[in-house]
């Protein structure tokens, strides 16, 4: 009996411990931290056990406030919807109003313009094609960019065909009375920036008929200050150099510029940018044969050439010889210089002279050669026939040559100085005779 009671008590103890352990284990599970998202709920209705619903009785003032709030919200939404629909249908009101006011101003000058639609490729097509020399020669069109260059072209009498602009203010900066025959197209500034060669374009690109120098009207003040000095470019193939040469010729008051075949096109965009409007300040005749060049010069003109490369010039600079005779071109003193001397034997004989000595005493023409090929035989022959000189600029030892544009600037302004001094001398003589 004692043994039975012992076993029963032991079993109860074990059962209690097991339940205790389970309780503690379950308690751990229940008391574990659980991060649950809190939800905010709002009761829809209150139901009582008898099935009735709770009804909320609002005052008349609360009802009026609620209905008034809903009415104001609905009206605001309606206004926003109508405003958006109006914008979608008629475009931005401010832009249209501004354009309409500007259009009224343009109507006073009798002008109309069109706005390029989305996907319009006229600017892209014209800009890419107008930069081709073959297209310019075939179609007779040139591309001008920027307000100043376009204004110079219009003032000289050039004929505009199409003008692309980004803002109406840019268009009004041009002389509107000279745009009657042009087609005006308003495009986005991003399109002009895409097809322009400039980093920061002004928003104006124009297509002109290729100007003819014989039909242009040049500024009277520039022509009155001109001197009988003619510039001939011989195989100048660098666009930047040619543009700078044209600019120097206009600044020095040259009479005209003649470009031989082999020169870069005078209407190349880079030439136009470098010349800074010189095309419309003095006549420029491009793509001429040497026979045509002679026809553009007066009969009593003396043609000089700019050259620093001849052996006689180097000897004169170094002080070895003072006067170079024709015998120096026919005989050689050493076998090392046979090739160089033989080359000069075959060339026309033109005496060298320092540029600051007297050489422009009447109508004078100056030939500037390209840096790659130098002077042509035709240029030297023309200088020989007119008793011209081979002009050179002395330089410090170790310097091979000057840039062609720099040499042209030095010689052109020296020629202008000599011609103006001659004119003043003749004027003083005439006054003395009158007295």
Swiss-Prot record:
One of its GO terms (cellular component) is mitochondrion. Gene3D superfamilies: 3.30.1330.30, 3.40.1280.10. The keyword rRNA processing applies. Residues 314-324 have a biased composition (Polar residues). Disulfide bonds: none annotated. It holds the Pfam family MRM3-like_sub_bind. Residues 1-42 form a transit peptide. One of its GO terms (molecular function) is RNA binding. Its main location: mitochondrion. It is found in: Mitochondrion. SMART domains: SpoU_sub_bind. It catalyses: a uridine in rRNA + S-adenosyl-L-methionine = a 2'-O-methyluridine in rRNA + S-adenosyl-L-homocysteine + H(+). Keywords: Methyltransferase, Mitochondrion, rRNA processing, S-adenosyl-L-methionine, Transferase, Transit peptide. Residues 314-351 are annotated as: Disordered. It comes from the Eukaryota. PANTHER family: RRNA METHYLTRANSFERASE 3 (PTHR43191), RRNA METHYLTRANSFERASE 3, MITOCHONDRIAL (PTHR43191:SF2). S-adenosyl-L-methionine-dependent 2'-O-ribose methyltransferase that catalyzes the formation of 2'-O-methylguanosine at position 1485 (Gm1485) in the mitochondrial large subunit ribosomal RNA (mtLSU rRNA), a conserved modification in the peptidyl transferase domain of the mtLSU rRNA. Also required for formation of 2'-O-methyluridine at position 1484 (Um1484) mediated by MRM2. Belongs to the class IV-like SAM-binding methyltransferase superfamily. RNA methyltransferase TrmH family. This is rRNA methyltransferase 3A, mitochondrial. It comes from Danio rerio. The gene is mrm3a.
């Amino acid at each position: 009996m004692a043994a039975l009671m012992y076993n029963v008590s032991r079993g109860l103890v074990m059962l209690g411990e097991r339940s205790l352990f389970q309780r503690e284990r379950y308690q751990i599970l229940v008391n574990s931290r659980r991060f649950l998202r809190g939800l905010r709920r709002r009761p829809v209705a209150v139901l009582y056990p008898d099935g009735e619903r709770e009804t909320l009785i609002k005052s008349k003032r609360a009802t009026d406030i609620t209905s008034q709030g809903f009415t104001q919200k609905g009206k605001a939404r309606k206004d926003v919807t109508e405003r958006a629909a109006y914008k979608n249908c008629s475009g931005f009101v401010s832009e249209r109003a501004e354009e309409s006011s500007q259009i009224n101003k343009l109507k006073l000058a009798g002008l109309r313009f069109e706005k390029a639609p989305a996907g319009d490729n006229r600017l892209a097509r014209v800009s890419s094609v107008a930069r081709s020399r073959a297209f310019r020669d075939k179609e007779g069109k040139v591309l001008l960019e920027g307000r100043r260059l376009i204004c110079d072209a219009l003032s000289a009498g050039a004929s505009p065909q199409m003008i692309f602009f980004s803002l109406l203010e840019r268009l009004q900066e041009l002389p509107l009375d000279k745009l009657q025959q042009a087609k005006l197209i308003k495009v986005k500034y991003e399109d002009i920036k895409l097809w322009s060669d400039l980093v920061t374009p002004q928003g104006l690109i124009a297509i002109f008929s290729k100007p003819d120098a014989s039909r242009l009207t040049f500024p009277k003040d520039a022509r009155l200050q001109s001197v009988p000095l003619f510039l001939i470019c011989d195989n100048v193939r660098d666009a930047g150099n040619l543009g700078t040469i044209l600019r120097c010729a206009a600044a020095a008051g040259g009479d005209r510029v003649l470009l031989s075949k082999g020169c870069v096109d005078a209407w190349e965009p880079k030439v136009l940018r470098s010349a800074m409007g010189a095309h419309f300040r003095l006549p420029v005749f491009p793509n001429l044969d040497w026979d045509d060049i002679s026809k553009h010069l007066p009969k009593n003109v003396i043609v000089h050439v700019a050259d620093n490369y001849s052996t006689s010039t180097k000897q004169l600079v170094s002080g070895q010889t003072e006067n170079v005779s024709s015998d120096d071109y026919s005989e050689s003193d050493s076998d090392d210089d046979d090739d160089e001397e033989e080359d000069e034997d075959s060339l026309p004989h033109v005496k060298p002279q320092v540029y600051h000595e007297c050489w422009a005493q009447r109508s004078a023409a100056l030939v500037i050669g390209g840096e790659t090929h130098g002077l042509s035989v035709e240029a030297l022959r023309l200088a020989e026939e007119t008793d011209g000189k081979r002009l050179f600029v002395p330089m410090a030892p170790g310097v091979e040559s000057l840039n062609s544009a720099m040499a042209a600037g030095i010689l052109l302004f020296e020629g202008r100085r000599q011609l103006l001094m001659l004119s003043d001398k003749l004027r003083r003589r005439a006054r003395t005779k009158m007295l």
